[in-house]
């Protein structure tokens, strides 16, 4: 009987923890704009964005890796076969060189899950032309 109650309590706490983890992973675009300032040394976003050290990030969410026009991507990035969906971006932003060994991106990654979710929410606001669109 005690083991049944213990198992039930464990299941309830695990479910509650999972629900909380899902809630905390939803991103806030406004907070993401602040996190994105760390990316601006290499990347631009918006209607007047231009490639620099890194490619323009307009419309990046949903785009195939290594495909923004007029940017010289590493072979590793071009040949990765990745699509920048939310799960892939989450993994990449946590440790870029781990997901794509040989990438030109020198940034080590974001350590906080909420920062990653927030910056993805920020990126999702911009279409391929750099216009803000409704999420």
Regions found by a protein language model. Name each.
Residues 85-134:
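C-terminal capping alpha-helices of c-type cytochrome domains
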Residues 7-15:
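Bacterial N-terminal signal peptides
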Residues 1-4:
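Positively charged n-region of N-terminal signal peptides that target proteins for export
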Residues 38-41:
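Short, cysteine/histidine-rich loop/knuckle motifs that typically chelate Zn2+
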Residues 23-26, 131-135:
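Long, low-complexity intrinsically disordered segments that are proline/alanine-rich
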Residues 43-46, 127:
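Protein kinase-like catalytic domain
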Residues 29-33, 47-86, 104-107:
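Gly/Gly-Pro-rich "capping" loops immediately C-terminal to redox-active cysteine motifs
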Residues 17-36, 47:
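Electrostatic cytochrome c docking/interface patches
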């Amino acid at each position: 009987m005690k083991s049944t109650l213990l198992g039930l309590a464990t299941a309830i706490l695990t479910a509650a923890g999972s629900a909380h983890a899902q809630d905390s992973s939803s991103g806030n675009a406004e907070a993401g704009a602040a996190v994105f300032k760390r990316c601006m040394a290499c990347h631009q976003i918006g209607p007047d964005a231009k490639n620099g050290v890194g490619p323009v990030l307009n419309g990046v969410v949903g785009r195939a890796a290594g495909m923004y026009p007029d940017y010289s991507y590493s072979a590793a990035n071009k040949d990765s076969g990745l699509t920048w969906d939310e799960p892939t971006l989450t993994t990449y932003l946590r440790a870029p060189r781990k997901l794509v060994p040989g990438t030109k991106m020198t940034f080590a990654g974001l350590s906080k899950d909420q920062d990653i979710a927030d910056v993805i929410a920020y990126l999702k606001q911009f279409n391929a032309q750099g216009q803000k669109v409704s999420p």
